Amino acid sequence: MEILGYKVRYVKLDNPESKKTLVLLHGLGASAERWAELWPLLKKYNVIIPDLVGFGYSEKPLVEYTIDFFVRFLKDFFEKMQIRNPVVMGSSFGGQLALEFSLIYRDFFEKIILISPAGTLERPTYVLSQYIFAGLYPTIENVHSAFQMMANTKEYVVDDTTVKDYVNRMRLPNAKYSLISTLLAMRKNHTLRNRLVEISIPTLVIWGRNDTTIPVENIEYFKRMPIVQTLIMEGCGHTPYVEKPAEFYQMIEKFIDS
């Protein structure tokens, strides 16, 4: 599929009996596969998971990856896919992008689920810096170390398939460029926290207690939103849907179906 003139890859999980459409937005440097642990649990819904332009196996043009560029990408994607009033779930940068989109298209989403959303940090944390380093120098050792730090729990061990997939993707042409360009755009938009009060869409915010990539203290900013629930998952780091998918699903199912 072409979005904004660029080839975009996406995963679609259909359920003809469901009236709910979920759109999952991955984080910085990730792909649709980052949600793979959750796929079997979401079978009661229609689920659409794009590789954002510049990431995964979508095209990686040499453009400036601004927040506005990603918002236009999403709008075109929704129109081409004929998606209306979805529940959008965004992890980290994907969460920030969902919020930025909502500030422009205020009634487009039915509900929003945010997992450790970006948009509030003034500067990268040590763990985030290590993740960026692993993206720029994608060896098995660097990536495994960064992913394990992001989980920040001994109970979860990063699997080799995830590591190898990330290494392979970050070695694709222009992958490092899009990573850095997007990171710069994220840093310019850390004032998102001051506009959260403007978003009146029902929102669920989930954070891992052990998250040191975007520390759990940042959840306080999101309590300013008019219609919001906030939950903290114990024993999880930056990606609770990867680390404890069954427990995570129990948290989101009630919110989605209510």
Regions found by a protein language model. Give the residues of each.
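Active-site loop/oxyanion-hole signature of alpha/beta-hydrolase fold enzymes
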Residues: V11, I49-M89, F93, Q250
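Conserved HGGG/HGGXW glycine-rich cap/lid loop of the alpha/beta-hydrolase fold
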Residues: K12-Y57
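Alpha/beta-hydrolase fold catalytic core
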Residues: M1-L22, K43-N46, I83-R84, I256-S258
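Flexible "cap/lid" loop of the alpha/beta hydrolase fold
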Residues: L99, L103, F109-T139
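Conserved loop-alpha-helix segment in the C-terminal half of the alpha/beta-hydrolase fold
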Residues: L204-C236, V242
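Post-His helix in hydrolase/transferase enzymes
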Residues: V242-K254
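Conserved catalytic-core motifs of eukaryotic protein kinase domains, centered on the activation segment
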Residues: R34-A36, S58-E64, R123-T125, V216-E217
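Conserved alpha/beta-hydrolase catalytic His-Asp/Glu region
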Residues: V8, R123-T125, I140-E198
